[in-house]
A protein has these predicted regions:
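A short acidic, amphipathic alpha-helical/loop segment
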Residues: 89-92
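Long, charge-dense, solvent-exposed interaction surfaces that engage phosphate-rich ligands
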Residues: 152
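PAPS-dependent sulfotransferase catalytic core
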Residues: 1-84, 95-105, 110-148
Length: 152
């Protein structure tokens, strides 16, 4: 499909999941197969408006930039896990890649949520985005953590 002056790249599959559910491990394992091209970076975040736990961006994807995320032909897999929780992603995928396949990684939600919360605190992502998740109850009241925890 052509959008403006740039072509939407071929993508065969999407690896989706909540943060801390094993997607990085699986993406790394998939890179070992010579017939698979995992997106580089792992999470180009072009299809979803969710650009991680905090940032959101509703602008149209830059298909030219997205094309550079796939270095080889093979089975192309976009590993932008946040597309699972993004309400716009299903429409974009259906419109541009109607035959795409999906691999979805899930994890028991309580330990996954605590692991995600700890990661956000360890990286300072909460503070960098104007939030204070130092207390779990306060973090849980933030709909962004709930969105990732409840799988969208």
């Amino acid at each position: 499909m052509e959008v403006g002056l740039s072509m939407v790249p071929r993508v065969d599959a999407f690896l989706l999941g909540a943060p801390k559910s094993g997607t990085t491990w699986l993406a790394e394992a998939l890179t070992q197969h010579p017939g698979i091209c995992v997106s580089e970076p792992k999470e180009p975040n072009m299809v979803a408006t969710h650009k991680g736990t905090f940032p959101r961006d509703d602008s149209r994807p830059d298909w030219s930039a997205y094309s550079t995320c796939f270095a080889t032909d093979g089975v192309r897999i976009d590993c932008s896990v946040h597309a699972l929780a993004c309400p716009l992603a299903p429409h974009r995928v259906a419109e541009n890649w109607p035959a795409a396949r999906f691999v979805i990684c899930l994890r028991e939600p309580v330990s996954r949520t605590i692991s995600h919360w700890n990661m956000i605190r360890d990286t300072g992502e909460d503070v960098d985005n104007g939030s204070d998740w130092s207390d779990f109850a306060q973090a849980w009241s933030d709909p962004r953590l709930q969105c990732d925890t409840l799988y969208g």
